[in-house]
Amino acid sequence: FFNWRFAQKGHFLLQHPYSLSAAPTDKFLRITVKDLGDHSRDIIHLKSGTRVFMEGPYGAFTKNRASRKHVLLVGGGVGITPVRAIAEEFGDGVQIDLIYRASSADELVLKGELDYLAQKSNGSLKVHYLVGSRQQHPMNANSIRKIAPYFADSDVYVCGPEGMVEAVRKAAKQVGVPKHRFHDEAFGFHAS
């Protein structure tokens, strides 16, 4: 993630962490911001050409950390943004299972983009949508293994609410994923 400041009245002194929501290019960095309050709600009103200051990147949510040919990406809610960004960075020879968890279908904000990436991947990216409650779709070792049979032999990347990140961490530990193959970008300023 990066810390962002926007040079506009009411925003300049505020610094907020946002993850990239698409792979970076030479000309563009993209963020997707969920309306969670005054600051995030006001971002939509920024004028084109507004000067932006950013600091980072922070965390270890990069494809360079992967060492396996199987990758499990898990995104919950707005945590899908860095997951979506990293999904397009892996090249040929890497099999990706991506789990996108949301309470309702309306919250699957990047579904169209993920469907497109999966379609153009020639089968190397499989996207699994889990829509509903935690009780309907628990993030435990058995349920994840049903979706991603190579879970135990995968590099695991997860971003989302703290409870979901911890549930996936516990499941990964149960199936034998070592700490160095578990990468998270949790909401807030901690990284492991």
Predicted regions and their residues:
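A short, basic/flexible loop-to-alpha-helix module at the beginning of a structural domain
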Residues: 57-67
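Short, flexible loop segments at boundaries between secondary-structure elements
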Residues: 175-192
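C-terminal helical cap/extension that packs against the catalytic core
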Residues: 28-33, 38-40, 104-158, 171
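General small-molecule cofactor/ligand-binding pocket signal
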Residues: 53, 126-130, 183-185
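Residues at the starts of beta-strands that form the adenosine-phosphate
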Residues: 70, 94-97, 124-126, 155, ...
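Short, conserved phosphate/pyrophosphate- and ester-handling motifs at nucleotide-, phospho-/glycolipid
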Residues: 79, 161
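Ferredoxin-reductase
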Residues: 1-53, 95, 101-104, 115, ...
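Histidine-anchored nucleotide/phosphate-binding helix
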Residues: 80-91
